[in-house]
Amino acid sequence: SRQTYEEYFARIKSGDPSKLVVIIDEAQFVAKRDASFMEAVAKLKKHKLYPGPVLIILATSSTVWATQEAAEQFKGAEMKLESLNFLEVVRHFESLPVAEIVRIYGAIGGVPAYLDKWDAAKSFKDNICRLVLTPSGALYGEADAVISAELRELSAYSTILAAIARGENKLNDIFHATGFSRAKISVYLKNLAAFNIVEKVVSFETGGWENAKKGVYQIKDTFVNFWFKFVYPNMSNLYLLSPEEFYDTYIEKELDAYLER
C-alpha cells in the first residue's frame, strides 16, 4: 500500500540525536499535488512524528506559494535567496578570465542552478549552443518556465517582453508595438514587476523631468532578457538552423554591444 507522508516522516532517523534536519526542495509541487503533505509537515514540526527537535526547510522557486499558501499553513522564518553577484560568479569560475565571466554573467546571470550547468572547459559559444539553443538543453525552455511558474497567458507576456527587449521600453512604445490596451499593458507590467522579471527605472534620456518621472521598463531577469533579445524573435529560424549557425547569425555580432548596455 502507498505510504503516507506522516508514515514516511515517522520513519526518518537522524544520524545526530540532538536534531533532525529535513530539507525538501521545490516543496510547492508536492503540496499542490497532495494536501496531506503540509498537514504531515505541521505534525512533524509539532513533534508528533519525531521525538526530538526538528529543523524543516521547505525550499521553493515559487514566490506566490512561499508568500501566500505556505505562509498561511506553515508559520516559521522566511529567507529569500538572491542570485549571486558578479564578484561571486568570478569566484565560482576562478579559472576563467574576467572577460569570459562578463559574457557568462551577461547571458545567464547569477542563478546558481544555471551556473552549475555551465561547462568552464568549453567556450561561451559551445555552452550557449548546448544549454540554450538545443531543444534538449537545460536552459532551452527556462525563460518560459520562469514566466509561467507564476503567471498565465504566456503568449501575451512574451509579446510584451519581446517588445521591451528590442528597445520598446516606454508604456506608449509597448502600446504601439503590441496592440494591447494601455490598461492591459499596465496590469501585465505590474505582474511582471511583482515577480522580479521586469523593473521600472527613471531615465533622463527620455527628455525632461516629467518624462523622467514616467520612467522606462527593462527586463530585470538576466537570462529572460538574453532569451527575448536573441532567441525568441528568431525562434522560427532556430528550428531551421543548427545551434552553431543560429549563434553565428543572431548572437555573435550583437553580443558585445548587448553586454555593454
Regions found by a protein language model. Give the residues of each.
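Sensor-1/coupling segment of RecA-like P-loop NTPase cores
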Residues: 29-33, 37, 41-71
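Short, polar/flexible loop-turn hinges at active-site or ligand-entry regions and domain interfaces
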Residues: 1, 49-52, 94-100
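Short coil/turn helix-boundary motifs
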Residues: 15-16, 48, 96, 167
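Short glycine-rich substrate-engagement loop in P-loop NTPases that contacts/grips substrate
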Residues: 1-15
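Accessory nucleic acid-recognition modules appended to NTPase machines
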Residues: 120, 125-261
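Short, well-ordered coil/turn elements that cap or connect secondary structure elements
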Residues: 17, 51, 73-76
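Interdomain motor-coupling "hinge/lid" segment immediately C-terminal to the ATP-binding subdomain
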Residues: 66-157, 161, 165-168
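Conserved P-loop NTPase "ATPase switch" module shared by AAA+ and STAND
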Residues: 12-37
